[in-house]
């Protein structure tokens, strides 16, 4: 396959070639970030699929597969993959013709087939960030494909879908190729070593101490942490991120950083924020969706107004109308000015099983959060030059297998430097 590939990539490429001639429908390519999974996908499309077609011609048989499609489980992953490969990429949901549907009888959001749903045949389908495929989506992938070859690309050591211990992709005995030779972080051996150690912990369940390395894996005191936050976050810097386990701790960090910047209002013109949950609105007759984790810039904010939520019980919500920009789109949305009140209302109507008001609150108001700190779950799929990790908050998780994955995902978000703060419980390895 040529010297352009390392040994792991070459094994996967050879396996993919054999896979195209086999009766197997699905294949897995797994590995941590920075090992060349995206490069390998391009190589398989540009080199191996043409080799397969040439082999079919030599054998005097037609090529079975007529189309190659690149997809990902999230909009963010699809965008990253499209930019990295210079190929059209869409979400697997869009490809299959699925939308999230609010079930007013149960209060749950489920996947529903649209008029665009059809059964795809004779295609080679790549699905990136496959660790996020839950049982519901996995079933629909099988329903929506016939005589296709599906390549799941991801990292089986990352965090699993919500309420599932592991993606069903990794519970099956599909052909499995693992890439472990790093291409990212290859200038930081200490980062490579700790990421390998934490990956091993996910696989074995054995926690080992985390050893600081000055300038690469720094362990800070309270005062040092405060100084570093001021240094990196006084002015907005999208190359740094603070990550923690709980939403409460994330909110504390973001509130502190907004105070450092002397922000006085719930929202400031020019502020960069991220969308917390998927949101759809209409522009004319066209539906526009802002996906979870999409970056949003506030362009203009109007005066505060009150919205009726439950007038019979004198329940109102204070909001502002804001002009925002996300990607190349500009649109006007309503933003709750008191996020705590907004969240309490959602939880109240959820507990009351009043699904009409519950979904009305979730669907009519954009839930924007500061981008400087996020949960580890939200950070999965992103990389930053410097990552700050709150170890005390992470230690509050009581599930060792979850902690192993949280540590692994947290550390593998960094390109150059990790900053540690707080205490990691001894049962989770501690600090060496």
Predicted segments, located by residue:
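Dynamic helix-loop-helix/coil hinge segments at AAA+ ATPase domain boundaries and subdomain interfaces
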Residues: 1-10
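Conserved SAM-binding loop
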Residues: 5, 70, 242
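Short, conserved phosphate/pyrophosphate- and ester-handling motifs at nucleotide-, phospho-/glycolipid
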Residues: 9, 74, 246, 381
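Short beta-alpha junctions and helix-cap segments that line functional grooves
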Residues: 137-138, 285, 402-407
